[in-house]
């Protein structure tokens, strides 16, 4: 379970999040709904430890994330931000393989490649997996990033506006 206890965050003098507490159960879908600027992205970034909270505590499976090692945390929780820009010449397959970094530190095993293949298949990217990211439509690129997060195989996946650029 992810537990957020009395968390606050401010930028300068502006409080973005004030005294927020929430429980996110493992295996459940939880959605944060609110207007632009309500702090949803900031909360997800604090839960994933991309940014530090000013007050309160965040726990994943009863472990305070401030005390978690990066490698261990990356095996428990993954995040897809609402805008992702990697300015490298990568194929979809190479991008998705980044999801396995917490397990292999860039030296992928046969098991890692199985996770990559499964994520590519799940997101219906098999036919274009060798295309470069800069050759893709916005929707194809978004599906590739989602596949990367799936390949990370964490217990919790945080998706910040995951339907951006996807045709529905």
Regions found by a protein language model. Give the residues of each.
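Conserved ABC ATPase "signature" region
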Residues: 97, 111-128, 153, 158
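The feature captures the beta-strand-to-loop junction immediately N-terminal to the Walker
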Residues: 33-35
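Helix-to-loop junction immediately C-terminal to a conserved catalytic motif
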Residues: 48
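Conserved structural motif at the start of ABC-family nucleotide-binding domains
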Residues: 2, 17-18
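Conserved ABC transporter NBD signature motif
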Residues: 56-64, 73
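Walker B catalytic motif
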Residues: 132, 161-162
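Conserved ABC ATPase signature
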Residues: 132-136, 140
């Amino acid at each position: 379970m992810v537990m957020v206890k009395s968390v606050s965050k401010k930028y300068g003098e502006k409080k973005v999040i004030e005294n927020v507490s929430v429980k996110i159960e493992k295996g459940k879908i939880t959605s944060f709904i609110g207007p632009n600027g309500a702090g949803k992205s900031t909360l997800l970034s604090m839960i994933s430890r991309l940014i530090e909270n000013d007050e309160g505590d965040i726990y994943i499976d009863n472990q305070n994330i401030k005390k978690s090692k990066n490698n261990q945390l990356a095996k428990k929780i993954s995040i897809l931000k609402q805008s992702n820009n990697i300015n490298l010449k990568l194929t979809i397959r190479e991008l998705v393989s980044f999801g396995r970094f917490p397990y292999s530190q860039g030296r992928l095993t046969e098991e890692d490649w199985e996770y990559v293949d499964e994520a590519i298949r799940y997101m219906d990217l098999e036919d274009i997996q060798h295309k470069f990211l800069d050759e893709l439509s916005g929707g194809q690129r978004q599906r590739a990033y989602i596949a990367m997060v799936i390949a990370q195989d964490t217990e919790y996946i945080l998706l910040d506006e995951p339907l951006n650029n996807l045709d529905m």
